[in-house]
Amino acid sequence: MASTTFSSAFSILSLPSSSPSPPPSPPRTLPVANRRRRAAAVASTATESPKVLELGDAIAGLTLEEARNLVDHLQERLCVSAASFPPAAAGLRAAAVEEAPVEQTEFDVVIEEVPSSARIATIKIVRALTNLALKEAKDLIEGLPKKLKEAVSKDEAEEAKKQLEGVGAKVSIA
């Protein structure tokens, strides 16, 4: 089958197309530096069969219209279509999303509830943690739940929670 596909593909390359088309444009040439890189790449494929190298050279010499015609012919011949192949970039993006779980680095300390017996002790702790004046600390405690600290490190949030729970307040870290 490989030889049949090879001979069919090669015969298409050598036959002119039946549809009228504009005259083929002259083939583009590579600058000397690019030719050297290409020559090095071709030299590394010297272990491949001569058929493969000959076919590769023939395909590389095609114009864009001839290449499009070759692709159409091979899709018909092999019963495949470009739509049957999923885009490669979509799979890479999905993998990248799964690999990088976002780790939270900033936390908010929220005072949920303060029993009436622990209000004075809680106000003292709030003043020590935030450097608020007495009136602002009292106002903070009255309209709960409220954020005591925003965007702090995990250690600082845990320490504040520990101190506030020590005097009887209910605290959460978000």
From Swiss-Prot:
Residue spans of biased composition, Pro residues class: 19-29
Keywords from the named record: Chloroplast, Plastid, Ribonucleoprotein, Ribosomal protein, Transit peptide
The keyword Heme appears for this protein: no
Location of the protein in the cell: Plastid, Chloroplast
Entry's Gene Ontology BP terms: translation
A molecular function (GO) term: mRNA binding
InterPro entries referenced in this protein's UniProt entry, alphabetically: Ribosomal_bL12, Ribosomal_bL12_C, Ribosomal_bL12_C/ClpS-like, Ribosomal_bL12_oligo, Ribosomal_bL12_oligo_N_sf
SUPFAM superfamilies, per database record: ClpS-like, Ribosomal protein L7/12, oligomerisation (N-terminal) domain
Primary localization: plastid
HAMAP family reported for this sequence: Ribosomal_bL12
UniProt record similarity statement: Belongs to the bacterial ribosomal protein bL12 family.
Descriptive protein name: Large ribosomal subunit protein bL12cz
